[in-house]
């Protein structure tokens, strides 16, 4: 079982989310990857969201903010250079959301920041949300991706 890590050097939201989806579609069932990336200014919307209802598209165009749709549900989020994004992608036999969340929590705690899991998908530090997470499955491959305010 190969465990892989990939850090994108691109800050293009379209490229990074396309890579995220490509990894989901092309990973072998016996593999697991942690993919990390940072996007320059972008609004990332969930798969079922209407961009005309969620975004001020004129202001986004004027401010050169990308609009990117992700493959998971959930609400719109703003990405910029202060936001680290991660994606755990694994065959269903290796996929363990609790273990993946604990990996993130333990890493944040190693930085001296007390944090906890809350609700369905959120991570909190001192009662404030610093990470939202979403999930999907295609065939025998599962994905858990999220954001971290840095």
Show where each model-derived region lies.
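Active-site loop/lid in soluble adenylation, ligation, and acyl-transfer enzymes
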Residues: 1-51, 135
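ATP-binding N-lobe of GHMP and related small-molecule kinases
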Residues: 39, 45, 55-61, 83-85
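A glycine-rich, hydrophobic loop/mini-helix early in the fold
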Residues: 62-84
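Catalytic beta-strand/loop module used to bind and position nucleotide/cofactor moieties
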Residues: 81, 85-150
């Amino acid at each position: 079982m190969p465990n892989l890590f990939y850090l994108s050097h691109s800050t293009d939201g379209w490229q990074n989310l396309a890579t995220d989806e490509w990894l989901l579609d092309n990973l072998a069932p016996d593999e697991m990857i942690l993919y990390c990336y940072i996007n320059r200014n972008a609004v990332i919307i969930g798969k079922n969201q209407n961009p005309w209802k969620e975004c001020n598209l004129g202001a986004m165009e004027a401010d050169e903010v990308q609009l990117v749709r992700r493959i998971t549900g959930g609400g719109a989020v703003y990405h910029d250079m202060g936001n680290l994004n991660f994606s755990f992608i694994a065959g269903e036999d290796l996929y363990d959301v609790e273990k993946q969340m604990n990996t993130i929590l333990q890493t944040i705690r190693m930085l001296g920041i007390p944090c906890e899991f809350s609700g369905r998908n959120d991570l909190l530090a001192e009662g404030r949300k610093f990470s939202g997470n979403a999930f999907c499955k295609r065939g025998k491959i599962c994905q858990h991706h999220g954001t971290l305010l840095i």
